Amino acid sequence: AGKSVWGSGFLPSVYQGVQCRSDGEPVLFINNPDDISSDERKASIAALSDINKLHYDEFKDPDILTRISQYELAFKMQTTVPEVMDIASESEYIHNMYGSNPHKSCFANNALLARKLVERGVRFVQLFDWGWDTHGTSESGSIDIGLVNKCRQTDKAVTALILDLKQRGLLEETLVVWGGEFGRTPMQENREGKTNSF
């Protein structure tokens, strides 16, 4: 996966995604540069937008429209991202339900963040969970321990996400798709894992 999955595919580039990181700054470069006030930033984005619109009128390049919308989105995100990304303010009940922990990186935090994004009107949210490569080279990669733990963590978080969406009346207008792409053969390897299916 990685940055390649955040593109817009065959759609105009204005539809590409914004990657939220689980460690460090959630969205890179969201804050104003040092010594630049919010008003100065807003004025510079407005000036850039005007220049880009003139450029678009002349060249009709759809990537220019993308650039305009990205600058505008980035400015709007400066005020909303810090609050939305703050899962520490959620109740103890919610953290217990999801299995989330604001002080460490985990899939449950991302599931809780997904609910917060849906609440804010984000139209498409995609979660990834890594570490499913159960070849049995370690305890965390074994079928009887590692795979069971991974399933337990994701099952709890996804169940909580669906229940939380339902309790808040958001599930009626939210399509939840759960899928995977990493298949294994039914044959056991000579270690505690299974081989790739391709």
Regions of interest found by a model, annotated:
Residues 1-198:
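Ligand-binding pockets and gating/stacking loops
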